């Protein structure tokens, strides 16, 4: 018999599975769950079903808290489609046969034709082939291509699910996960929204391995407490634990974001600088100070060169620790109706070019040593904010079909862009670096950019000129 397809009965399978386990002679009636990625997402669904034998869960690297498994926000951060679902689909189904595609039911045929006509998709042969086959064996990527908006009611359903989860949970993710978004955000959103005994762990940039073996010492302490009643002290410790890059040490906190956070705006300024000093009033500056910084990005059909604006602080006089969510307020105009905004935060090391020849025989590298920390994404037409769900440090966008609005070319628009959280100490002599771009390119294998876990994004098929303003009336700034 053939499978009924994706995730048809899983909403009740969890409860039935736990019920079966409790009837076994080797079960004492106390059940826990552990797993990563999809196996983490299923733990949240099981917890919401409320079986009394489920005493605790440990979902690490779960998917988004909004939309369930493969929800819109998982694969469209800020409305920008990325290609991780292509990897999931093709690696799983590349060997399976396809038939000649037939007529799709109802509105699905219309959505398919709209996707086939999308010039942005036509730049990517691998993605376009999925459309020509009408998604056979590649349902996840096909659905992302043909349904480029969040369905109405998804957020309300998620928030109802939050209220149903009452079991203790220990969730988390790693710093690597900002590249494909869903795990990094899922852990934070569940921790923030679910009221139950809880703990949160953010680990470093090294990816968890398969089979999953990292942090099992912590998992055992967790379940010794909740399943065996052993006092391991785990619930006496601070609820938040995170790896601080730069300092390379574990830190703890009482909540997330950390209650002691000093939110600090860093303003974009002339000559590619990033400063805590706000722009001077227009009366004190000349017209030149009101002029924008500009970059023009040609599409992938013309170039693989990624254009960008780059802003850096002066070398820091002392260590600066940045921990938590980040947002960018950007005042900008474009000369087309849409673009992607891709925001990159970097730690740039000391400029060794200031050394004299006496200190070495011209051992000056071609580039400054720098380390990417995190990114943010926003498709310009998806800029509408959900004010009730937004915070200053995490803009929350609507992303529904009725909220999509093309940009008026030449109009200066205020964008609030969510940059995913990080935890890093910028050492004295280093610089905080912000880059603004609109494109990334596929440079690796398996629909990835650079390395396995950095998907690229569907970009504009038009040549777009971007103008970024940073004067007193339009104070573009990064909130750290």
Show which residues each predicted segment covers.
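Alpha/beta-hydrolase fold nucleophile elbow
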Residues: 25-37
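Accessory cap/linker subdomain of secreted extracellular hydrolases
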Residues: 48-164
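Cap/lid segment of the alpha/beta-hydrolase catalytic domain
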Residues: 1-23, 70-75, 350, 357, ...
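Glycine/threonine-rich phosphate-binding loop and adjacent beta-strand/alpha-helix elements that clamp
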Residues: 193, 215-217, 227-480
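Catalytic histidine neighborhood in serine/cysteine hydrolases
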Residues: 194-207
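Short beta-strand/loop motif that positions the catalytic acidic residue
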Residues: 165, 171-173
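Short glycine-enriched nucleophile-adjacent loop
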Residues: 39-51, 330
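Conserved alpha/beta-hydrolase "acid-adjacent" motif
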Residues: 178-186
């Amino acid at each position: 018999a053939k499978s009924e397809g994706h995730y048809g009965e899983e909403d009740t399978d969890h409860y039935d599975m736990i019920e079966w386990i409790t009837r076994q002679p080797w079960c004492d009636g106390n059940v826990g769950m552990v797993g990563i990625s999809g196996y983490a997402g299923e733990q949240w669904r099981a917890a919401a079903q409320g079986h009394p034998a489920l005493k605790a869960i440990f979902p690490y690297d779960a998917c988004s808290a909004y939309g369930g498994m493969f929800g819109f926000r998982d694969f469209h951060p800020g409305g920008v489609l990325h290609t991780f679902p292509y990897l999931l689909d093709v690696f799983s189904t590349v060997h399976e046969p396809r038939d000649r595609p037939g007529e799709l039911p109802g509105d699905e045929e219309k959505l398919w034709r709209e996707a086939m006509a999308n010039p942005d998709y036509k730049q990517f042969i691998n993605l376009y082939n999925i459309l020509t086959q009408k998604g056979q064996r590649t349902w996840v990527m096909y659905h992302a291509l043909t349904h480029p908006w969040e369905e109405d009611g998804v957020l309300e359903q998620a928030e109802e699910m939050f209220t149903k989860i009452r079991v203790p949970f220990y969730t988390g993710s790693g710093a690597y996960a900002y590249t494909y978004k869903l795990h990094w955000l899922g852990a934070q959103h569940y921790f923030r929204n679910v009221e139950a005994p809880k703990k949160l762990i953010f680990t470093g940039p090294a990816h968890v391995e398969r089979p999953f073996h990292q942090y099992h010492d912590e998992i055992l302490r967790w379940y010794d407490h909740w399943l065996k009643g052993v006092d391991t002290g785990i619930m006496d410790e601070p609820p938040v634990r995170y790896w601080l890059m730069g300092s390379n040490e574990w830190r703890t906190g009482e909540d997330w974001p950390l209650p002691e956070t000093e939110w600090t705006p860093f303003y974009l300024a002339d000559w590619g600088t990033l400063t805590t000093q706000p722009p001077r009033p227009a009366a004190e500056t000349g017209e030149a100070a009101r002029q924008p910084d500009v970059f023009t990005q040609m599409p992938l059909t013309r170039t693989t060169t990624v254009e960008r604006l780059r802003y850096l602080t002066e070398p820091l006089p002392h260590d600066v620790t940045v921990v938590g969510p980040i947002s960018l307020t950007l005042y900008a105009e474009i000369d087309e109706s849409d673009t992607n905004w891709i925001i990159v935060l970097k730690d740039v090391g000391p400029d060794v070019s200031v050394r004299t020849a006496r200190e070495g025989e011209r051992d000056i590298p071609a580039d400054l040593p720098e380390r990417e920390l995190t990114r943010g994404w926003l498709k310009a037409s998806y800029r509408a904010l959900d004010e009730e769900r937004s915070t200053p440090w995490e803009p929350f966008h609507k992303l529904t079909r009725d909220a999509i609005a093309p940009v008026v070319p030449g109009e200066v628009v205020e964008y609030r862009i969510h940059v995913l959280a990080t935890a890093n100490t910028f050492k004295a002599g280093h610089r905080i670096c912000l880059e603004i771009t609109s494109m990334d390119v596929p440079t690796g294998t398996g629909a990835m950019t650079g390395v396995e876990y950095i998907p690229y994004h569907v970009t504009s098929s038009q040549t777009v000129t971007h103008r970024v303003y940073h004067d007193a009336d339009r104070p573009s700034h990064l909130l750290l």
